[in-house]
Amino acid sequence: VNQFNDIGGVNLCVNQKALSVDHLEVCGSEAIQSLIEGIEQAEGGAGAPTYPVALPGCSHFLSIPYTPGRAIIDAGLPLVLATDHNPGSAPSGDMTMVVRLASLKMGVLPVEAVAAATLNGAAAMEVADEVGCLALGHRANFVLTHPMEGIQDIAYRFTDAVVDKVFINGEIWEG
């Protein structure tokens, strides 16, 4: 809602109890405060929170500012990362690149970026009881990486193919 300007869409989405609000490239303190209030209302039993969704691929492709991911996380909000894969502003579905951009351009730690792309993404789509983490009763959707020193290498080795294998429902995906 705030891809190019703050149009008040964050507050509207929170008031309407939308599950998520995307395109937060322009996201100031008022918008962040509105998201905090939405989380507090949800914790008080007033519906689900409105998840803030960053789309760093759009920022990269359009050369516009990045969502203030660090400020959103520091405010205690569950940042979500997504691709917004479309031919106009984000012609890529590469989630590894999204995680890298969040780490390199939004001030998000690699471990936070992975959580934003998995756990928080599943929560924002209301499927966290099925996917988003490796847990008993969840579908086994995950990736194996090539050998790395640690999760920080995903961002540091920003041009390397770090994913070795993809598993969907516990089966190797050959796609």
Predicted regions and their residues:
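C-terminal cap of metal-dependent C-N hydrolases
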Residues: 139-175
